[in-house]
């Protein structure tokens, strides 16, 4: 039986960090309990060890800590999450404690929140379609099981509504396999938290969801643990309970701000924009926990959502996220201001695995050709619109005017489906054909004749 030593040698507190002296047999990432003079228990984690000193990161903040009267205990293990299949349908705080008024979980086991490194050889290739019910994603930027596909948003854009829509509607097509949503919120307001919980409750989606809520008034340092706790729950459900799990994490910008706060408190040499130089490595320890494993039925699919500071896609957070993940969904202020919901800008958006989750047997044989044709037609339509601004509409040819008509209807009917319309992939593909029929058949050069004969509507639009 291991003996837990108690220390009263805290020597310094700087922001979210505490220095404990005269320690021995302490390890990196070890869980720490700090008992305050009033009996309150706070938790932390060992960040660094030098000789007989340990630097502890405090999850609940350092306010009210009396160094002389505080008792520090090192648990002998890393921060762990109590997991059970009964987590599904429950709401937890950012540290994994129930906050929905329900009973405490009876844990099946305790898992290290940092997870286990996945051997690349044991990974299975993502190739199965996930239907979100959103045409701009399902058809043009297809999401597949095991993928990590981030949403790049901006200040004031409705990324929360988009996240809630995906959480409500996402499903595995033509399958009776278990599907679950793990939702991790970091630094959101009380109103936003209420919005998410109410949206999932009123549609019944809460029954297949696990929510972890770190609010804006919770300690910023807790945000470093929240996504790891959520991913630990997702891995448990996926690889031990054979469920297909979609993990939605919002807002990753708040997570990175918490990392910067800890880095500044440690007096580390800052990197780009003041973020720590290891930001890329740290983000990869989250994003790379998505995937499928050979011999396992379950999968973990990630949709991280981040707000780009000043709408700058070259900012370190979206920039590094783009390097690690497999594409991006970009929200547009221009589309939002025109009243389109969700305001997904499909031209710069990308899913690098979209060709792996589409086609006969997965969606439909005309998926990829119509996707390519819609992209080409919309891009041409936007060019023609710019030309009309410079030269006037009178300078446009008859075909150019059809492209303008196509673009207008594409934005109004295809992109602008609303946050509460759930379109299955059949309806999305059929709508795509209806819009393409606006253009002359001679312009549809990316679709083979046999598909044109089969699907192109015969009536004039």
Curated annotation (Swiss-Prot):
Say which family it is in.
Belongs to the ATPase alpha/beta chains family.
A Pfam family the protein falls into: ATP-synt_ab_N
Q: Does the keyword Signal apply?
A: no
Q: Which GO terms describe its biological process?
A: proton motive force-driven plasma membrane ATP synthesis
Official protein name in the record = V-type ATP synthase beta chain
Its biological function? Produces ATP from ADP in the presence of a proton gradient across the membrane. The V-type beta chain is a regulatory subunit.
Give the molecular function GO annotations.
ATP binding; proton-transporting ATP synthase activity, rotational mechanism
- Originating organism: Streptococcus pneumoniae serotype 4 (strain ATCC BAA-334 / TIGR4)
- Which PROSITE patterns does this chain map to? ATPASE_ALPHA_BETA
Recorded hits in InterPro entries, A to Z, give: ATP-synt_VA_C, ATPase_a/bsu_AS, ATPase_F1/V1/A1_a/bsu_N, ATPase_F1/V1/A1_a/bsu_nucl-bd, P-loop_NTPase, V-ATPase_su_B/beta
Q: Which NCBIfam families match?
A: PRK04196.1
Q: Which UniProt keywords apply?
A: ATP synthesis, Hydrogen ion transport, Ion transport, Transport
Alphabetized HAMAP family for the sequence = ATP_synth_B_arch
């Amino acid at each position: 039986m291991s003996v837990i030593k108690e220390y009263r040698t805290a020597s310094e507190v700087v922001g979210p960090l505490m220095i404990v002296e005269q320690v021995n047999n302490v390890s990196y990432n070890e869980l720490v309990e700090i008992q305050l003079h009033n009996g309150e228990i706070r938790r932390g984690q060992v960040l660094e060890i030098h000789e007989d000193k340990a630097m502890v990161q405090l999850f609940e903040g350092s306010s009210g800590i009396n160094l002389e009267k505080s008792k520090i205990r090192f648990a002998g293990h890393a921060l762990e999450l109590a997991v059970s299949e009964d987590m599904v349908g429950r709401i937890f705080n950012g540290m994994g404690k129930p906050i929905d008024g329900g009973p405490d979980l009876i844990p099946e086991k305790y898992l290290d929140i940092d997870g286990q490194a996945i051997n690349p050889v044991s990974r299975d290739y993502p190739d199965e379609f996930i239907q979100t019910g959103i045409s701009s994603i399902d058809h043009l930027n297809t999401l597949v099981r095991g993928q990590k596909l981030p949403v790049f948003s901006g200040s004031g854009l409705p990324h929360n509504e988009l996240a809630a829509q995906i959480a409500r509607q996402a499903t595995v097509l033509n399958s009776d396999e278990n599907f679950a949503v793990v939702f991790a919120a970091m630094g959101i307001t009380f109103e936003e938290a209420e919005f998410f919980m109410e949206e999932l409750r009123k549609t019944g989606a809460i029954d297949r969801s696990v929510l972890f809520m770190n609010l804006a008034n919770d300690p910023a340092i807790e945000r470093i643990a929240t996504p790891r706790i959520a991913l630990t729950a997702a891995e448990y459900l996926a690889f031990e309970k054979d469920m297909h799990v979609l993990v939605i994490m919002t807002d990753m910008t708040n997570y990175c701000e918490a990392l910067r706060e800890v880095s500044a408190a440690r007096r580390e040499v800052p990197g780009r924009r003041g973020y720590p130089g290891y930001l890329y490595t740290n983000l990869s320890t989250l994003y790379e926990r998505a995937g499928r494993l050979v011999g396992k039925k379950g999968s973990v699919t990630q949709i991280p959502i981040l707000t780009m500071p000043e709408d700058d896609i070259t900012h370190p957070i979206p920039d590094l996220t783009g390097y690690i993940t497999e594409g991006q969904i970009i929200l547009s202020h221009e589309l939002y201001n025109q009243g389109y919901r969700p305001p997904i800008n499909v031209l710069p958006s990308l899913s690098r695995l979209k060709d792996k989750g589409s086609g006969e047997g997965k969606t439909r044989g005309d998926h990829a050709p119509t996707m390519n044709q819609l992209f080409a037609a919309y891009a041409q339509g936007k060019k023609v619109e710019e030309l009309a601004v410079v030269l006037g509409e009178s300078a446009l040819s008859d075909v150019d005017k059809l492209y303008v008509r196509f673009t207008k209807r594409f934005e109004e009917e295809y992109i602008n489906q609303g946050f509460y319309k759930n379109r299955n992939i059949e309806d999305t593909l059929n709508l795509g054909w209806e819009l393409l029929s606006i253009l002359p058949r001679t312009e549809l050069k990316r679709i083979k004749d046999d598909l044109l004969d089969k699907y192109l509507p015969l009536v004039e639009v």
